[in-house]
């Protein structure tokens, strides 16, 4: 009931203003009696992924809490994990406003945020300050003004700084809103990046006597051959996981709607089938050697089950969470327990 009221108010506001209000409110109320307004108890449904055991298979996707300001509040809602970020080595403002658009009739969202964040050092402070023991993945990216050819340096800087504070690290090379970023998904650039990241991971594991798994987040706008090439690179470089998928540049199912022609990545219900197809193809190519975290267009328990059936071991929600609220977490977990 509370979420429906809050949603009604926030949906009258500019989307980005509403987002900042939500994150700020959650930050203020976390670890206080006010968590009763949105907190809930979720039945245990443990799942093992990348050598880690999560209390349930439903996580919050990256992008909602970029700077890790409201982690404890999302823990109260019952998420099995939270993926913060995308974070970059240096703070950056992201792209020009407006850059976030609702497509309410389609339960979709278009964003061209551009990795706006307060920088990795600020994120680390927030990770240290969190009071709960929720699993936190850290999604890392490159700064906009870093040339693509030098992009791996930004990823390595972020890895170095977040390593001790992350349950796992997600390497984001699939956002459509940073010029040239998706080129890192192909050919020599991909192999060089994954090799450098794996080398760094092993160095940090030896230095800190702690192994932190690494996952690669990929786009939905890939051919079968491109998915096969990415899978081969993941296996070759012994990555621990894959996250599929990010937002899409396609506009299937939203033509004619207000805001549908805005540039940026489309998420939410219009992405459901495409992301599931990519998960299925990726699972075929990975042959069970690397687990997949499924994300993209999960708007119901049925959508989540389709991701599991396609080959995902765990799922994440974002746009569906905005449209459905915390109840979606419980619905997915309950359905997962029964499957």
Swiss-Prot record:
The keyword Membrane applies. FMN binds at residues 62-66, 86, 139, 172, 217, 245, 268, 297, 318-319. Substrate binds at residues 66, 111-115, 172, 177, 246-247. Keywords: Cell membrane, Flavoprotein, FMN, Membrane, Oxidoreductase, Pyrimidine biosynthesis. It holds the Pfam family DHO_dh. It is found in: Cell membrane. Its cofactor is FMN. Pathway: Pyrimidine metabolism; UMP biosynthesis via de novo pathway; orotate from (S)-dihydroorotate (quinone route): step 1/1. Its main location: membrane. One of its GO terms (cellular component) is plasma membrane. The active site is at 175 (nucleophile). It catalyses: (S)-dihydroorotate + a quinone = orotate + a quinol. It is an enzyme of class 1 (oxidoreductase). Its EC number is 1.3.5.2. It is a peripheral membrane protein. Transmembrane segments: none annotated. It comes from the Bacteria. One of its GO terms (biological process) is 'de novo' pyrimidine nucleobase biosynthetic process. Binds 1 FMN per subunit. One of its GO terms (molecular function) is dihydroorotate dehydrogenase (quinone) activity. Monomer. Catalyzes the conversion of dihydroorotate to orotate with quinone as electron acceptor. Belongs to the dihydroorotate dehydrogenase family. Type 2 subfamily. This is Dihydroorotate dehydrogenase (quinone). It comes from Shewanella baltica (strain OS185). The lineage of its organism: Bacteria, Pseudomonadati, Pseudomonadota, Gammaproteobacteria, Alteromonadales.
């Amino acid at each position: 009931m509370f979420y429906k009221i809050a949603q009604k108010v926030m949906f009258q506001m500019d989307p980005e203003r509403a987002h900042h209000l939500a994150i700020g409110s959650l930050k203020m109320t976390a670890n206080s009696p006010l968590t009763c307004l949105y907190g809930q108890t979720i039945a245990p449904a443990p799942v093992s992924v990348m050598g880690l055991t999560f209390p349930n298979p439903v996580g919050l996707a990256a992008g909602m809490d970029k700077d890790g300001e409201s982690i404890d509040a999302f823990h109260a809602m019952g998420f099995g994990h939270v993926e913060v970020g995308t974070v970059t080595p240096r703070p950056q403002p992201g792209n020009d406003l407006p850059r976030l658009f609702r497509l309410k009739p389609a339960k979709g969202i278009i964003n061209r945020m551009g990795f706006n964040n307060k920088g990795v050092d600020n994120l680390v402070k927030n990770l240290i300050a969190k009071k709960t023991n929720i699993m936190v993945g850290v999604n890392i990216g490159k700064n906009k003004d870093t040339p693509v050819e030098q992009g791996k340096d930004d990823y390595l800087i972020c890895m170095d700084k977040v390593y001790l504070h992350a349950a796992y690290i997600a390497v984001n090379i699939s956002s459509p809103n940073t010029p040239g970023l998706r080129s890192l998904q192909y050919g020599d650039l991909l192999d060089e990046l994954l090799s450098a990241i794996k080398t760094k991971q092993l160095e940090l594991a030896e230095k800190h006597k702690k192994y932190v798994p690494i996952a690669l987040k990929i786009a939905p706008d890939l051919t079968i051959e491109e998915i096969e090439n990415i899978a081969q690179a993941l296996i070759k470089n012994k990555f621990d996981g894959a996250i599929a998928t990010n937002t899409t540049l396609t506009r299937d199912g939203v033509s004619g709607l207000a805001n549908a022609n805005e540039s940026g990545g489309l998420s939410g219900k219009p992405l459901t089938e495409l992301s599931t197809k990519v998960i299925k193809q990726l699972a075929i190519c990975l042959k069970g050697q690397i687990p997949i975290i499924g994300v993209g267009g999960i708007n119901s328990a049925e959508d989540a089950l389709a991701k599991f059936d396609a080959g995902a071991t765990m799922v994440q929600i974002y746009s569906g969470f905005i449209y459905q609220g915390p109840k979606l977490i419980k619905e997915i977990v309950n359905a997962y327990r029964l499957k």
